[in-house]
Amino acid sequence: MNVIVDPKKLIKGATGDWEVVIGLEIHAQVTSNAKLFSGAATAFGGAPNEHVSLVDAAMPGMLPVINAECVAQAIRTGLGLKAQINLKSTFDRKNYFYPDLPQGYQISQYKQPIVGEGVVIVDIGDGESIEVGIERLHLEQDAGKSLHDQHPTMSFVDLNRSGVALMEIVSKPDMRSADEAKAYVTKLRTILRYLGTCDGDMEKGNLRADVNVSVRHPGEPFGTRCEIKNVNSIRFIGQAIDYEARRQIGILEDGGTIDQETRLYDPNKGETRSMRSKEEAHDYRYFPDPDLLPLEFTAGYVEELKAKLPELPDEKRARFIADFGLTPYDAGVLVSERESADFYEAVLAKLADGTRDGKQAANWVINELFGRLNKEGVAIDASPVSADQLAAIVDLIGEGTISGKIGKDLFEIVWTKGGDPKALVESLGLKQVTDLGAIEKMVDDIVAANPDKVAQARAKPQLIGWFVGQVMKLSGGKVNPQAVNDLLKSKLGI
């Protein structure tokens, strides 16, 4: 069988090239004030067992009642993933014993999930993208948390998370490198944040990944996969995949076989280790939950939710490229977080009609603002420079009141001290020199003082940039560099 495989994604081995095959199961905590089947709060950081109802604690006689908002959030997510929405789905009991699972089973969806197949378009750099298929999305309860470090001889259980709604988003095994897997999780998290269905906070455990990894020679059937459980950072996902792929290749090249098992990733050692043999579905003895009726809703309800969806990153990126002439890269940077895209659009909305330049605004948001935010470790919603202030700076440059260099100085002043950019230009005397006579005198002075450079510039016209720089320096950045450039060309006969 002839199979075309990108050689950059292959791993060199003693017995030839190997291809890694990756599928991900993402557990995303649903953004909701209450849990999936109870009215207990979902707030993070409460005292142990503060947010626990009788349902969450599995007290006898307590019956689950579905949270309609969690259902709506799952449908919104399915729509955002361009997936099939199933108008009828059912809940099942997944039976296993663990101390932080008080019911002795987890309420999940097995045979009939709420969302079927979908797709995510993932940018992987250099203008390339891949399609990652979505197998399904289903709703389920989260478990509690066992605490083993509170007492030398006892373990404790915190049920605050017990019963919190999760969306398990199962991908198809369509990824072929750690970088692709990381890009997929990043894109999926962005979509969830745009939709407002999950905050994607991996540090709080609100987004976790089970990573399925297998290896094969290109063109061969899929190998035996191992599942790496509960990886809680995008960086660790990449590290776990790289280690696990090489571990499996080493075993196979030594003549061994891969055991289908569940493994854990240890970020301190940078390795995976065996946790238990991988269970099959029959090990969990799934059966329909007798306490919950099938979940049914109408196509009209789905359309109602669809009509209220926000513009998603792919559509927003395409609009930025088409309407504002942005490069695909710049548009991608701006839409990578909803807050970033909103800030950019707020800047555009404040620009004067005559100077509305989408590219110029994007350059200032990406290079100056994002660069400074990253350097200082400040979130965009806490930016010292507001969208109104940045728009004013871009306007001042666009209308020729200040130069680009002075614009950067003005940005620094606003960042550190605040203030109205237009008022600061007046009070600090930052206006651009527009008197052609004054500009011509500066040009003449620089030309007269550097006859050797004049000869060089006539031989190599690109050296005119040196003269422009000297005039800018002499003026304190207050002249228009294009006007200086044109004047120099005339003076030097270039």
Swiss-Prot record:
Pfam families to which the protein is assigned, alphabetical: GatB_N, GatB_Yqey
Listed InterPro entries: Asn/Gln-tRNA_amidoTrfase_suB/E, Asn/Gln-tRNA_Trfase_suB/E_cat, Asn/Gln_amidotransferase, Asn/Gln_tRNA_amidoTrase-B-like, GatB, GatB_C_1, GatB_Yqey_C_2, Gln-tRNA_amidoTrfase_suB_CS
Gene3D superfamilies per record: 1.10.10.410, GatB domain, N-terminal subdomain
Biological processes per GO annotation: glutaminyl-tRNAGln biosynthesis via transamidation; translation
Keywords: ATP-binding, Ligase, Nucleotide-binding, Protein biosynthesis
Keyword Disulfide bond in annotation: no
GO MF term list: asparaginyl-tRNA synthase (glutamine-hydrolyzing) activity; ATP binding; glutaminyl-tRNA synthase (glutamine-hydrolyzing) activity
Top-level division of the source organism's lineage: Bacteria
UniProt-listed Enzyme Commission number(s): 6.3.5.-
Catalytic activity: L-glutamyl-tRNA(Gln) + L-glutamine + ATP + H2O = L-glutaminyl-tRNA(Gln) + L-glutamate + ADP + phosphate + H(+); L-aspartyl-tRNA(Asn) + L-glutamine + ATP + H2O = L-asparaginyl-tRNA(Asn) + L-glutamate + ADP + phosphate + 2 H(+)
SMART domains: GatB_Yqey
Quaternary structure note: Heterotrimer of A, B and C subunits.
Function according to Swiss-Prot or TrEMBL: Allows the formation of correctly charged Asn-tRNA(Asn) or Gln-tRNA(Gln) through the transamidation of misacylated Asp-tRNA(Asn) or Glu-tRNA(Gln) in organisms which lack either or both of asparaginyl-tRNA or glutaminyl-tRNA synthetases. The reaction takes place in the presence of glutamine and ATP through an activated phospho-Asp-tRNA(Asn) or phospho-Glu-tRNA(Gln).
Homology family: Belongs to the GatB/GatE family. GatB subfamily.
Record's protein name: Aspartyl/glutamyl-tRNA(Asn/Gln) amidotransferase subunit B
Gene giving rise to this polypeptide: gatB
